[in-house]
């Protein structure tokens, strides 16, 4: 349903954001 789609999109965005933050903090990209 729509909520599942939104949840998936939000999760993907959060994971991408965390990856970028971790990349900057630890220098492991």
From Swiss-Prot:
It comes from the Eukaryota. One of its GO terms (biological process) is defense response. The keyword Disulfide bond applies. GO terms for cellular component: extracellular region. It holds the Pfam family Antimicrobial_2. Coiled coil: none annotated. Disulfide bonds join 23-29. Keywords: Antimicrobial, Disulfide bond, Secreted. Its main location: secreted. It is found in: Secreted. Expressed by the skin glands. Antimicrobial peptide. Belongs to the frog skin active peptide (FSAP) family. Brevinin subfamily. This is Brevinin-2Re. It comes from Pelophylax ridibundus (Marsh frog).
């Amino acid at each position: 349903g729509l909520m599942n789609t939104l949840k998936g999109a939000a999760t993907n965005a959060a994971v991408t954001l965390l990856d970028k933050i971790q990349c900057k903090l630890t220098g492991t990209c």
